[in-house]
A protein has these predicted regions:
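Short, acidic, small-residue-rich periplasmic hinge/interaction motif at the N-terminus
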Residues: 37-41, 69-73, 83-128, 166
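Signature of Gram-negative outer-membrane beta-barrel scaffolds
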Residues: 485, 511-632
Length: 634
């Protein structure tokens, strides 16, 4: 935490009558703090700083204490001696230690005294670097980092840190871990609007200052969202780009209310586009809401909600380079020319925008598609819907809504002790699509060679024609039984958690921290009928409870259906010692994790519970300042 000294300038000259104490109230960077409260202790006199931060209070000769308060900043008091002339007192307020605890304690951020390799990207630089890309792309110029947009679908980016993939990079938003509790992966499409709400992003490479039990061997990414602004106002921004890209962002802040105790902030984002790669369209919303309430000098509460309901077409299949350009492939030393020679599997090329995960379809096909994402038929759609585009069908589409709600409490117990806690809920509803049953490709592919033969595309019209004329009298006299369909692979989850950290300053050199990390999650996995592709029903044989097969229609569960619970409890203790040019850091933690699994497609439908897994975590580091510009750490 950067602590900047209060700057006070007093100018006194003699006079006979009541004079004024005047000055400016700014932050440490000299930005005016409009609306700051300026009061004279023990009196009813006071005022509010103007838009330029200026204040003025008339006082009789005497000695007074002037106190300035502003939400999100440390209150400051200064003794003022009034004589016979005006007195000028300028206040430069430092960010509140409680506010910084949201950054440093809950999110475990590193600073210049932490023996950690880190890079922090502020809001202005974030907007400049990122534009409308996925969040990882803002870090692509950071040492030891590789980020890629992969197939080009919105939100399909990934990041590697020091050679480790996202499963080994802890991602946190406002101090709350966001890695999947089952496999550790991070799905950036879930956070499509987080960059618009981000105040800064810090990437800690390798050993991190994070003391939670997170998969952070590669590093840790801390994303801090905008606090509720004390200044009233709004902003509208619109961005456009290739592929019919259009993004509109609206933000509004209420400013201070309720006696300068409450501030609210909100952002809403709408993003649409056809995509550069074929059929990688995007149809997304994003929202962010923040509230800050200063209950008293010792307690502040913050409420955050962020989410990004979205749908987008994907490009997931890897291709031989000759699929895109045979000329480019031929220029590569050592490339096997038989891969695209006449009569071989790459007789044609698809071009750079080629995408195997879609295909054209006749607009005469009016079949509905089923998908669900927190609200059937609601604001974000769901239920039985028309397909995204009447002229084509995506084999691979992602749709998901993962809201995150945090309630933070920051408490100053005394001058040496602070308590920071966050209670959170993270939901999740949506999934990805694919084929199920028999499929048609063009040009036709023999057997299972489809994954080696390219470029080919989907022949949806052939599939629809087959399914539309396929009466199976064993199941129904007149209705058509689909041979192949589109399916949803869905994930629905609810995660609740509590993170609490107590900081105690033992001395000027030593600070200790103890903490608790509790999480519990319930997760459902299944596949559903998305599109019957011209038929009236499909027969599925995956459920042991229906050994003769099960007739399914739009929205019905097929293939598999299981539920998982994850229960997590952990604790830690951490110490940070600073003396002159030396800084030492160390922490130790203990975590216990329990899993349960229930397969609903078994006759027993039994809940299988695994024994708890207990793990120990230990970290340590040291840093030595050689001079003000050079330091070494391990």
């Amino acid at each position: 935490m950067n602590i900047r000294n209060l700057m006070v300038s007093l100018m006194m000259v003699g006079g006979l009558f009541a004079q004024s104490v005047t000055g400016l109230v700014t932050d440490a960077d000299t930005n005016p703090l409009s609306g700051a409260n300026v009061v004279v202790d023990g009196t009813e006199m006071g005022t509010v700083a103007s838009e330029t931060g200026f204040y003025s209070i008339k006082l009789d000769p005497g000695t007074y204490t002037v106190t300035v308060t502003f939400i999100g900043y440390s209150s400051q008091s200064q003794e003022v001696v009034m004589g016979e002339e005006d007195v000028k007192v300028d206040f430069a307020l430092a960010i509140d230690a409680i506010t910084m605890s949201a950054l440093e304690v809950l999110a475990s951020r590193a600073d210049e005294k932490t023996p950690v390799a880190y890079t922090t990207v502020g809001k202005e630089e974030l907007e400049f670097r990122l534009g409308s890309q996925d969040v990882p792309m803002a870090l692509n110029t950071t040492p030891s980092v590789y980020a890629t947009q992969q197939g080009g679908g919105a939100g399909d980016a990934r990041i590697n840190v020091r050679g480790f993939n996202q499963r080994n990079v802890a991602v946190m938003i406002n101090g709350v871990p966001q890695n999947d509790m089952e496999n550790g992966w991070v799905y950036w499409s879930n956070w499509d609007g987080v960059a618009d709400a981000a105040q800064s992003i810090q990437l800690q490479r390798g050993l991190s200052a994070v003391n939670l039990a997170t998969p952070s061997i590669g590093g840790t990414m801390n994303i801090i969202t905008n606090p509720a602004s004390a200044e009233k106002g709004g902003k509208f921004k619109q961005e456009g780009g290739a592929g019919s890209f259009l993004k509109s962002t609206f933000n509004y802040n209420t400013g201070l209310m309720m006696g300068d105790k409450l501030a609210l902030s909100g952002t809403i984002v709408r993003k649409t586009g056809d995509g550069i790669i074929d059929a990688t369209w995007t149809d997304a919303w994003a929202y962010y809401m923040g509230a800050s309430f200063q209950a008293n000098d010792k307690n502040r509460f913050e409420l955050y909600a962020i989410g990004a309901p979205q749908r987008h077409g994907q490009n997931l299949y890897k291709q031989n380079i000759a699929t895109y350009s045979q000329e480019l492939a031929g220029d590569i030393d050592g490339y096997d020319e038989s891969a695209y020679a006449e009569g071989a599997k790459f007789q044609t090329e698809g071009g750079r925008t080629f995408n195997q995960n879609w295909g054209p379809v006749s607009s005469d096909y009016k079949g509905k598609q089923y998908w669900y994402m927190y609200g059937v038929g609601g604001l974000f759609g769901g239920g039985n819907q028309d397909r995204y585009n009447s002229g084509f069908l995506n084999e691979r589409e992602n749709f998901f809504h993962k809201p995150l709600v945090n309630l933070n409490h920051f408490m100053t117990i005394n001058d040496k002790t602070r308590l920071s806690s966050v209670l959170y809920w993270s939901g999740g509803s949506g999934g990805g699509t694919g084929t199920y049953g028999s499929s048609f490709r063009k040009p036709a592919v023999d057997g299972e060679k489809w994954y080696r033969s390219s470029p080919w595309g989907w022949d949806w019209d052939a599939a629809i024609a087959t399914n539309s004329d396929r009466v199976d009298t064993d199941f129904h006299a007149t209705e058509n039984r689909s041979k192949g369909i589109l399916r949803n692979s869905i994930n629905r989850q609810d995660t609740y958690g509590l993170i609490s950290k107590l900081n105690y300053e033992v001395s000027d050199d030593l600070e200790l921290q103890v903490g608790l990390d509790w999480r519990t999650a319930g997760i459902e996995h299944a596949r559903e009928v998305r599109d019957l592709m011209g038929g009236d029903y499909y027969m599925d044989y995956a459920d042991d409870n229906a050994p003769d097969g099960k007739r399914v229609e739009l929205g019905d569960i097929i293939a598999y259906h299981n539920s998982t619970t994850v229960d997590w409890i952990g604790g830690f203790v951490q110490g940070n010692y600073t003396k002159d040019k030396l800084n030492l850091y160390g922490m130790g933690g203990l975590s216990s994790i329990k899993y349960s699994y229930q397969d609903h497609f078994t006759v027993a439908n039994e809940v299988v519970k695994a024994d708890a897994i207990s793990t120990i975590q230990a970290k340590g580091g040291a840093m030595y300042d050689i001079d003000e510009n050079v330091f070494t750490f391990l």
